[in-house]
Amino acid sequence: MKWVKRIALGLAIAFLVSTVVNASWLAAPPKGYPRLLAHRGMMQQFSRAGLSDDTCAAARIEVPVHDYLENTLPGLQRADGLGAAMIEVDIAATADGQIALFHDRTLDCRTNGTGEVSKATMAQLKALDAGYGYTADGGKSFPFRGKAVGYIPTLEAALNAVPTVPLLYNLKGKTPDETPRLITALKAAGRDVVKVGDGFSAPDSELAAIRAAFPGVWAYSEDSIKACTKAYLTSGWLTMTPEACRNGTIAVPLNYQWAFAGWPNRLIARMEAVGGHVIVTGPYRAGSAMGLDLPEQIGEVPSTFNGVVWVDDIWTIGPALHPATNHRNAREEAETAAALEVRRKARE
């Protein structure tokens, strides 16, 4: 059947042309280098299997190989020391008008407190044990209990702890005034978020206020990332950058790099031309971390990539990219290696 052969030939030619015109080498190598974004700073790793918004992540951590907790000053500073070029922090408004760093809507999972974070004053939060609820054995032992009293920090303390490190402020809309309070707090602290290179992850409803307060700042929502990424997966092969990516953000999972036209150099050039940003994430699959959490994964990031690499385990990824930051002793090396093997086998 000649018409079938003609269609097949036409499709083959179209595919070849599309591949050639989108070749990465057609764009000059971008300036810069991969920038590690440490998710919550240094944090304890936990199982994502069956994870939901109501799951207590602190109750399912892996056997700890370090003593750092997420959204704490020691955790932020250690992430900085391990080569994080940016740190994601979780924003929570308190009952007395302050901004704290805390991931959950309620205190019950991680701390010895109860109720909503927004109903507690900063003084009440500082009195809590931030490591109270962490367990790796179903509640038989709690390795951080009693060791993190007073560890829930204010935003101001975090800014002072890592003053030159760009922060990605994660707003979940826990309270209606979360965004205006954060804006006020940043301005009161004299933080030049654009100059420092800060960013904002927030619900769509909050982006306009953030961009109005800080013109030119990097700001995105989960929905806007999905829109840009999905649109580019089709229009990119037609050599077009979709409108959804203008001043937007695209996410490239490690295991789907092949699906993005012009990856990496051509895609980066296209996104830069429309004021966009590019994030490399961990493999896209059920039960996996959003960010990189195995040291070998950093080798899958193209050497010419100059955007953000989302990292869940900066303890291992940092030294994998920046060997000079590795100051683990022999015991820590052995425990880390064992933990990584358990993590790998869990995904087989």
Set out the residue ranges of the language-model regions.
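Phosphate-group recognition and catalysis centered on beta-loop-alpha active-site segments
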Residues: K2-E348
